[in-house]
């Protein structure tokens, strides 16, 4: 039997770089919120212990794909603690809607969905804390998708505090370029000393993203899309880009602006949600 599992996008409603550690990682403060839009992962259980990704990504080796890595990590962790039923395996496929290198968390969300779904389907019984800890070894954004609630993140993104920001409507636009995260974080002009503030203070301030100035400077496509969106609504970069988003109070307002978009602007409208569609599907 094949089951389908949501793998939602996320937005960074704000992102501030507060420092850089000796190991090179940047410390930050950011606000994650999910979208009711994303990829869909289909899973069919196998009884011979094999993991097979039926929809490979061009240019990514099978064993390097985050989906496969997540499945194998769960398999090993559960087996090591005697919680993996004999023969547990899976055929996995993905209906990919989220762009790579877009700042929407697609790969991290895929990994989290696989961890949560296979833990349920294989009946391993690992806790959310255990799954989140495993997820952190796959990527800094994986734990928030595992836990499934909008969150204020600190440290390198691993310290999560659940929050409930307003659930607005967003026009999310992809400028047609992919921005590797290191390109932004290695830029010498990236702001790295934004003062730390409490979540209460940050929620009262106008939101912004410290990475935006670098993305706009280095990628004219990002600058062009943001310049157009800013004529209609508050707009900013998500993550390290390349996607940008404009926020609206209603779906109709967002769709009206999308209908006016120039042909070169590729976008979609989605609602911000504080409970992940993955976790809603499991209720």
UniProtKB/Swiss-Prot annotation:
It is an enzyme of class 2 (transferase). It holds the Pfam family GHMP_kinases_C. The keyword Transcription regulation does not apply. It comes from the Bacteria. SUPFAM superfamilies: GHMP Kinase, C-terminal domain, Ribosomal protein S5 domain 2-like. It catalyses: 4-CDP-2-C-methyl-D-erythritol + ATP = 4-CDP-2-C-methyl-D-erythritol 2-phosphate + ADP + H(+). Keywords: ATP-binding, Isoprene biosynthesis, Kinase, Nucleotide-binding, Transferase. ATP binds at residues 99-109. HAMAP family: IspE. Belongs to the GHMP kinase family. IspE subfamily. Homodimer. Catalyzes the phosphorylation of the position 2 hydroxy group of 4-diphosphocytidyl-2C-methyl-D-erythritol. PANTHER family: 4-DIPHOSPHOCYTIDYL-2-C-METHYL-D-ERYTHRITOL KINASE, CHLOROPLASTIC. This is 4-diphosphocytidyl-2-C-methyl-D-erythritol kinase. It comes from Shigella dysenteriae serotype 1 (strain Sd197). The gene is ispE.
